[in-house]
Regions:
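Extreme N-terminal tail/first-helix region
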Residues: 1-16
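A short, structured beta-strand-centered segment in the mid-to-C-terminal lobe
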Residues: 9, 84-99
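Amphipathic, well-ordered alpha-helical segments in soluble domains
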Residues: 13-20, 49, 100, 107
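Short, contiguous alpha-helical
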Residues: 28-82, 102-149
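Extracellular-facing binding/remodeling surfaces
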Residues: 23-27
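Phenylalanine-focused residue identity feature
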Residues: 16-17, 85, 97, 142
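Short amphipathic alpha-helical segments at helix-loop
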Residues: 2, 38, 82-89
């Protein structure tokens, strides 16, 4: 997939999720899906995930190959009452998601082929090595996957 195609897929997935999130009726926000997640929890989770991905993308571009990127335990974040996954209004998380995705899209559009091959080591629950190409594929689909697509 070319950089332009990646950017278009990323932008499309962003708009898909934003339309879906903004369209959830207030009385449906706390209905759990078969996996146990409510729309409210998914919206908050995606805002957190995108904030992490934005920082990771910036590090992939700016730091030397082999640098360590730090992950986070999304399951612990989901159950920390202070983070509000169960009760906080979703408007701020939707705004965070939109802003961070817009910032990431700006970066993606400026990438070149050599940027896509750069790798970083992950201090991340899923471990391994990452590169811009695989992280970009994950980010372009992630909103669709978590929103039931």
């Amino acid at each position: 997939m070319s950089i332009q195609e990646s950017a278009a897929a990323y932008e499309s997935a962003t708009q898909f999720f934003l339309n879906l999130a903004r369209g959830v009726a207030k009385d449906q926000l706390d209905v759990k899906d078969p996996e146990g997640w409510s729309a409210r929890q998914i919206i908050h989770h995606l805002a957190d995930s995108e904030a992490q991905s934005y920082a990771r993308l910036r590090r992939l571009v700016a730091e030397p190959e082999g640098s360590i990127i730090q992950g986070y335990d999304e399951n612990l974040w989901a159950v920390a009452p202070q983070l509000g996954y169960e009760s906080a209004p979703v408007e701020n998380s939707i705004a965070i998601f939109a802003a961070v995705r817009a910032g990431s899209l700006d970066i993606i559009k400026r990438l070149n082929e050599s940027d896509l091959e750069k790798t970083l080591s992950r201090a991340h629950p899923k471990g391994g090595r990452g590169d811009c190409r695989s992280d970009d594929r994950t980010r372009s689909r992630f909103g669709d996957n978590r929103s039931g697509d």
